[in-house]
Amino acid sequence: MNKIDKDILKIFESKENEQFDEDQEKDEKKMNEVDFYSILNISRNATDDEIKIAFKKLAFTYHPDKQTNEELKKETQDIFTLITLAKDTLSDPKLRAIYDQFGLEGIEHSKAIVNKYKEVDKLLQALDRIQKENEEDKLIQSFSATGSQSISLAYHHEYRHFFFKTLKSEAQFDIKTQKYGSFEFVPSITRKKNLAWFGLETSYLYPITQNTELFLSNNYNEANEGSIQTIGLKSLLSANTYGSIHCAFFDSFQPARFGCLLTRQLSPTITAIFRGTLQKEFWQGSLTLKRIVQKRLFEITIDSSNLGGLSGSITRDIPISKKSRISFSVGGYGGGFPLYSAGQHGFTGAAIGFKRKITKVFDIDLSMHVNPSRYLYVIGLHHRYQSLEIPIPIYSDLSLSTSLLFFTLPAVTLSLLKYLVVKPLMKKKEQKKIMEKKEKYADQARKAKRKAEMDITLVKQLVENKVLKEKTKNGLIIQEAVYGKLDEKVDHSDPFSVEFPPTIDVTIPLQYLVEDSKLVLHGNNKKSDLLGFWDPRISEEKQLKVTYFFQNRLHRITVNDIDQLLIPLKSHLIQ
């Protein structure tokens, strides 16, 4: 594939960037923050009347003056204070606007803001301005920069020494905007022996319509004493098909080159890519079939041109562990065109590679490439923002066994180091991290569990009366409700798991929320903040499974933590 086609394919195909976890402390803080909407069990757009009704219902149960037991009176004081704070915050338009925008932390620091803006409209305008500033910050964050260094070392087997061959350093700057499109700049410096030259690749991508984008690129290189300008369009042709066309112009006397690229999703696992190039007295075409199943890649590529004949390659890339991959590829050619006589065929090369993910942002790879004229070893170190590759070509004769030993020895050494040293240390570190996390949330979980038990004690008599009332009209009766990690079981060998099981019984709290044979839990609200609930697995995804009777018929439904729950529904009926 020529350089222009590689650039077009690079622009055309979406980049598969690895998603990294957000900052753990911020995420945990957000997960653990109290949700006023969940406490009152109201929607995000609830009216003042709905807020008052929800507050009155909870105040009837949790008001300290209604408790005859002194211990319960003391315990309910904190809950009633929290319920009152939720009602006061959401009933005040200013405080509610701040809470919706900044959360509980914003309320804690909102006194100066509320005093500054006496009118709600001005307050909302200020919040809108802050939101726009945040969007501008995101725009700045859309700028990214990465670097790559390649140090090429060569080895002469006869003289038994390495020597410096080529050094290339490049940086890539990406600027992505919704209004003005995307820009990419890739300056580079290459040094070979006593010569050095500068290169600059630039590209611009602009959306013309919803499905069509214009791209422009320029590739300048001092070594070639000129540049190549490319202009083209890429478009979504159908639900499963993308296409692009381009034209490249050269500063030299070469004629313009036209090209096209077509990508079609044949099935959920198979993709076909066709590339074509046409120039005066030259044409080239290639077809790639790519199949990916459970992160296992199988790829076949066939190239054909009027000068180079017919060639092809097969690539296989498979994971051997959660963090390691191994790949194989082999290529060959066939005759029938001017470069090869009719019927001539042969071997063009083979490669084997090993890639290992060390951390979330760092990985290494080792690969060996073999062709009829040389062996090439490549050592790669890849960071999120920087990459270093060291190709080592060997130009003189060398036995295959020696070559394989040269390639496998570092991999075997790294594997032994991993299993004997690194893995035990990482396991010990991970266990320590888990224990620290458990200890950190143990007190918090105990308080939440004790509060939920007190909630259930307070509403138990009310729930029994509700159940009797619902039975008289064949209404809604919660048979069983379980909340937490439904696919996880109690580990009786772990004291923490025994004390804080992965799931909790919330049958009574849910029955308490039933009104007139209906139950509504609003979406986008954490269910762990509902009264009578507590979070058995902080910062982990949870579900709520409810089994209930309605009209003497059994129903069952499972929803995610922030999904809406509306019962009864016919779709929940167990046939």
UniProtKB/Swiss-Prot annotation:
SUPFAM superfamilies: Chaperone J-domain. Keywords: Chaperone, Coiled coil. CDD domains: DnaJ. Pfam families: DnaJ, DnaJ-like_C11_C. It comes from the Eukaryota. GO terms for cellular component: mitochondrion. GO terms for biological process: cristae formation. Residues 35-103 form the J domain. Residues 427-456 form a coiled coil. Belongs to the DNAJC11 family. This is DnaJ homolog subfamily C member 11 homolog. It comes from Dictyostelium discoideum. The gene is dnajc11.
